[in-house]
Amino acid sequence: MKKLKTKPNSSIVHPIMIALVITFMFMNISFANAVTQSKVNKFFENLNTLEADFIQVSSSGNVSNGKIYFDLPGKLRIDYSEPNNLLITCKGFWIVIQDRNIKTTNNIPLNQSPFSILIEKQISLSNKNVKTEFENKSGIISLTVKSSNNEQAGQLILEFSEKPFNLKKWIIKDNFGDITTVLIQNAKYNKQLSHLLFFPDEFPEPIN
């Protein structure tokens, strides 16, 4: 007796194949995300200090440059070159902004600045007080960091090159909607920094 050949039911096979393909894709994505998170976690676990040159581009297109220093946790210095000649320092609960051309000083609470996410404590992707999102495109890894309990802190987007794995720039979005992009160059990691870097300048008292 001749055996009949039967065709597989396409209405069953196609959904199964699609499900397998989707499952495989998500397994790859999950694995890639896990590897990426591991690299980022390792970067921050090993990060104690940073010294680098920077180029800053504001929402309006203004370009500034200077030197930046981090000593984690809690210390920050952004030293702008002329003609801006601004100095931003932090070594506690306040960010001090100084205009050295006109000798003025303004203070803002650290917790109202996007920098609070980065310098109050070293970033941990398992920190419940911080929301994180990953994106990996064309060898550039983006990590978006937001405070879970403080909308005033805005958000910070950190961009890393994949090979070699290094911090390349960050983008600050404040609670007013302004966007500032900072490109990092000539970065030196974990170099010993003088604690004096993080003190504001002392301006002479105005003469009446």
Model-derived features: positions:
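Solvent-exposed strand-loop boundary residues in beta-sheet-rich modules
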Residues: 58-60, 101-103, 176
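Gly/Pro-enriched, hydrophobic low-complexity segments
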Residues: 127-132, 136-207
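Bacterial N-terminal signal peptides
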Residues: 15-28
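N-terminal secretory signal peptides that target proteins for export/translocation
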Residues: 1-13
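Short hydrophobic/aromatic-rich beta-strand segments that constitute the beta-sheet cores
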Residues: 54, 76-80, 95-98, 143, ...
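An acidic-aromatic
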Residues: 67-117, 180
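Boundary at the C-terminal end of the N-terminal hydrophobic targeting segment
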Residues: 32-34
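A short, Trp-centered hydrophobic/proline-enriched beta-strand micro-motif
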Residues: 42-61, 69
